[in-house]
Amino acid sequence: MPVLLLAQLSPSTLQYVILGVAALTGLAVLMHIYFQMKRSEDLEVIATELGMAFSAKEDSRLLNKLQFFPTFRLGHTSNMKNVMQMATEHGLLSVFEYSYSKTDRLTDQKYLATTDRRDFKTRTYHFTFATLEIPEFLCPHFSVRPQGFMDETLSNGMQDINFPYHPVFSNSFLLYGQDEQGIRHFFDNELMNLFATKRNAYVEAGNDVVALRLKGRQKLEDIKKFIAEADEFLGGFKHCSADPANQLV
């Protein structure tokens, strides 16, 4: 409501307006909390059906392992929740929801020469992750993104690693990381063929963890399918640790 219009209201009317706004704000907050709790309850039911352990709160042990992955170094006010875990034939599979907030400057030309806080906008980004911790497994830190997805890491100078003998993989994905030689040793034909079966794969990996990232929170009816596909896909990395040439000292 415009300030001039508020100034024309009587004190009693203004009081009702303020109370109304406060009530609506409070209701919105309560509804948000309710839906968050309801989603956690629904995910716990799914986890129980699959024989998975569930926690609505973050797994600090796993989160500590992921701190060096690109996504987990972005933004501020990050949050890991609704963690589902189980041991599979490939390793410890974890599925969880993750979000972070990021404040960006508006790109409109009229804002570029100012520093007013109104020139900035904070956005919250939501993701669904599946991670696989593989015993006796060690890999270089790397990220794989679908081709055409430019991000901060590449824009800051890191180069896409290509394989001339596997054009399907190189033309479909961006692969990058600090240890190019180690990454080239790690990626064999079998692994690149695995990516050819999942062209939208967005993967971050390092040490004994491989993570598959999806944008947004998944629909409840899609969770079971995602878990099964993630375990199969991430399990395809396990063979790489069998080759001594792929091991880092």
What are these regions (language model features)?
Residues M1-L4, A28-L30, T115:
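N-terminal functional modules and adjacent low-complexity/disordered segments of proteins
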Residues M1-T13:
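Short, strongly hydrophobic alpha-helical membrane anchors
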Residues Q15-A23:
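Hydrophobic H-region at the start of alpha-helical membrane spans
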Residues L24-L50:
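Transmembrane-cytosolic junction motif
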Residues D42-V249:
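Charged, low-complexity intrinsically disordered regions
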